[in-house]
Amino acid sequence: MSRKGAWPIAVAAGAAGLLALAAVAAPAATAGTASSSTGPAAVPKWRITESVKTSANFTAVVATGRTTGWAFLGNGFNAAPVAFQLSGGTWKKAPFPGTKGDEAVIDAAATSPSDVWAFTEGTGTSFPGGTPARALHYNGSKWSVVKTFGEPIAGASVLAANDVWVFGTMGFTGEPALGAWHYNGSTWTQVSKTIQGGSALSASSVWGFNGVNVEHWNGAKWTATSVKSLLPPKANVDMDPQVVGILALSARNVWAIGNGQDTDEGGPTVVLHYNGSKWTRLAQANRGFAAGPEFSSDGSGGLWIQNFSPEAGTAYLLHYSAGKLTVAAVPDGPTKMAVYAVSQIPGTTQQLAAGETHASRNFGAGIVAVLLKYS
């Protein structure tokens, strides 16, 4: 994700608003007179723009321009991930060097249509039969593998072709975690062994999280700040509340998502914000497990956040705006659609999203992979 903070693909895998209305009429003039007309403003909404009947779902998406982007189809089981390229507003399948097995694209990020990155989750190579995670780059004409990691990737930030950050997830018991890695265009360097996700502003300003802490990298060291008091109270004996995603937009505008980790339904979900001096909790909703890295800015001060309640068979796309979390309207509703990734179209309040439709309250039946657009 490019400065953005996914639902684990093993369970199901780069968020945000009822946005500004667009003017739809232009003034007309005749000789000696002038007149203007104004039609009703178009109300933005989510709509499906691509559907693929398959047993898999779209796991990641990135907008690379107003009418360009990439999306990735797969479920991490047997078949290799498949890429779709958006050009001129039309999605088409494109060549991609995916590998069969437990590989799925967990995140995608870009700085331009000719600098696009895809990151596969992998299962880790610490145990027999495990698969590596990979970082792949598209230069405008072809994809190539840049780096292979022995542990799973959870997300990434891409600032330039020579400024790429990759973040791991919490390792299984007895398995090492990937931590945080930086790529300067020639060399990969591990800068943390404990960071579980992150979002970069520059090579010397990176935000990450680990459990109840948010951490900041200044180019030389990490500084941790506990936000435990801002998270929901512990709801069960099995899982602790924790930070699950972070999105840095500027030095004084950093967002984090926390979750209470209730055993069955997940939640509550909280929105945290850093204004350059302190962290505060701005909103809370009694919804399911908040998605990790791929939540998105809505381009107008809010967020789009993916959210899931597996036991209830529901998936919500939440919108944060002006201190409130609300459930966004999606084409098939929360019982028949799941959104796994959201990406802001650069310079706009429009969004691309990736996910699936499925049988009512059943993520495993009747799957149709879908791509959506908010405009």
Model region roles, listed by residue range:
Residues 1-32:
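Secretory targeting and sorting signals
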